Design a protein with these regions (language model features):
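Signature of extracytoplasmic/envelope-associated structural regions
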Residues: 1-153
Length: 153
């Protein structure tokens, strides 16, 4: 059995210009190292019963997927916003300017992401993704932002 290297990965991410439309991701958008990247598909299958005895094929439900990962809580060491903050915080409901991000429950022009990664040799992409973030503090250690994004597979 092959060893799963899931500790440190690079995830490509780009904010979409039109919500729900996948963006082309290049190497310049895949510069943020992430930890503990997981991908889960939540696709359902509906089995259909036919009263007259015929055969009706079942239907696949919506192609929904979720990506979760951790990012170290760190800045640039100079003025400006780090790449992970400008990319991952707006789709979680945060509006930022000059290094200050404020959570807004509902706002017009909600940002969405296209996320792309290779996991165990398989290409994974979700688009139209929005999510949630949680900050985990470790006393005397490294703090992490835990992101979870749900989108279209």
């Amino acid at each position: 059995m092959a060893y799963k290297c899931n500790r440190l990965r690079v995830l490509g991410a780009k904010i979409e210009t039109t919500a729900g439309t996948a963006e082309a991701i290049t190497a310049s958008e895949a510069t943020v190292p992430v930890f503990n990247l997981t991908y889960t598909e939540n696709t359902t299958y509906t089995r259909r019963e036919n009263v007259s005895g015929g055969k009706l094929k079942g239907r696949r439900g919506p192609l929904i997927a979720q990506m979760s990962f951790d990012v170290e809580a760190m800045g640039l060491g100079s003025s400006g916003d780090p790449a992970w903050a400008t990319t991952f915080l707006p789709p979680c409901g945060f509006v930022g300017s000059t290094g200050v991000y404020t959570y807004t429950r509902v706002y017009a022009n909600q940002k969405t992401l296209t996320l792309k990664s290779f996991i165990d040799g398989q290409y994974r992409l979700i688009h139209g993704a929005a999510g949630a973030v949680r900050l985990t503090y470790n006393a005397g250690g490294i703090s992490y932002f835990n992101f979870t994004f749900t989108g279209i597979a």
